[in-house]
């Protein structure tokens, strides 16, 4: 039970000014008469016990018994032994010291009495049995001395040892008031652990402190320790939240929107093993190296076949003044790459836009988009050499109609729901989230440096079947193109656009037409022979007839075609390419001046 319950009756006396101020009592006997008029009945005691006030019942019973007795008998007697050695006893978990001088103070004495009354149920029962413990014997009053008569004390029991308390006097009204004041000032001893309901709530921590952190991304060398970081490239787009461990950082872009790409050296160009302060960088949009070059080119051809114009490029550079202030010699080395020269002692910035969607590489609807890579290769072009010195990559997903912002918001909501479901989850290693409305985290994405400087990127030029970048600004042409025929793919190169071949879809149809197949037989034969022309021209036809019938190709001088209406015409490349595929003919051979003359009669 608490000390608050122990002092309940005392608090009533202290806090009720009527008890002490309404009537001018001369001593405590008159003051207690008002309380004795309402005796402490058994019913009252039972109600107090039901409420858990056992100690208050014992204390009130003691006070009632004390003041109901004659004043002459209110003496606390003690044994003649005085302060003997038996006074130091361990009674009910309390060690009584022989020196009781501190009990002469009213405050300490009342505290001592209350603690013993409230802490010892056996002791309170003994008090109720004997009721001879006088308050005057316990509470000393200055100016009046009361001697302790010899003889055994009535407070003693068979299980209790005697001890001596100082002499006491009658306690007047003013002293009683001051005593209650001092008792109220002494904090009661806590006897139980306080209820958690009354504890001060601990300071609440943020729900997701790791998400609300808005500190900027550390520089690239700290993001990717152990990788070469002589150069540092950033893309001006927020970094995606959900990134798998070990993968390159990812950014969401809108189709056709220009984003700044910043290139710099952390040390300001100092300590770099370069032959010149100017380097050439190639910014390109490529597929991951896991895809073979043939598959990458197939994807690019499929994308280009669906574009409205042959001039449509994968990557574009904005014609803004800031580009030309920091970079020089901008060239479009391929449809998915551009190059420029910049000074390593200064920061370079270009604005690029990507014109393809991640879902443009499949004709099926609902297929997940293919992620692309934004790759930047930097070459040392000094002293007539072109040496690849640095490469960095980041993943990009391209959306249309502000889809990048919607994707970021969706990722934020997913991250929030995951955090709410698992508030104690620590799965935040490769993932960064955002909770606040409009919060986009870090507004830049750092490109991760790559250690593989050997793999050549696959670049796409529609009029070349295969092209691979060997040096910045140079492309390896396909067979049949000499180095002198190499076209510079600059932005202002109009001849290239004018001489550009039809779209890949039309090219595919033309390829089907170029595969010319003829069905021929002689008049004496009933079954046709198939003549597959290696090339859809007259030379291809002569070569096929020579191989089929064992004739020398150089001896075939004339080839004619006789229409159904009997018109005889000279066979030429145009007729073979456009009017002879899958056509059946009767083959008639004749000799003229030692040369072979062939007539194909249309059936």
Swiss-Prot record:
GO BP: central nervous system development; cochlea morphogenesis; ectoderm development; epidermis development; establishment of planar polarity; establishment of skin barrier; eyelid development in camera-type eye; gene expression
Domain Grh/CP2 DB as annotated: residue spans: 226-461
InterPro entries per UniProt: CP2 (IPR007604), TF_CP2-like (IPR040167)
Compartments where found: Nucleus
UniProt keyword annotation of Transmembrane helix present: no
Keyword Transcription listed: yes
Swiss-Prot/TrEMBL keywords: DNA-binding, Nucleus, Transcription, Transcription regulation
Region (Transcription activation): 30-95
Biological role: Transcription factor playing important roles in primary neurulation and in the differentiation of stratified epithelia of both ectodermal and endodermal origin. Binds directly to the consensus DNA sequence 5'-AACCGGTT-3' acting as an activator and repressor on distinct target genes. Essential for epidermal differentiation and barrier formation at the end of embryogenesis with TGM3 as critical direct target. Exhibits functional redundancy with GRHL2 in epidermal morphogenetic events such as eyelid fusion and epidermal wound repair.
Additional observations: GRHL genes (GRHL1, GRHL2 and GRHL3) show a paradoxal lack of redundancy despite their extensive sequence identity in the DNA-binding and protein dimerization domains and the fact that the core consensus DNA binding sites are identical. They have related but remarkably different functions during embryogenesis because of their differential spatiotemporal expression patterns during development.
Listed name of the protein: Grainyhead-like protein 3 homolog
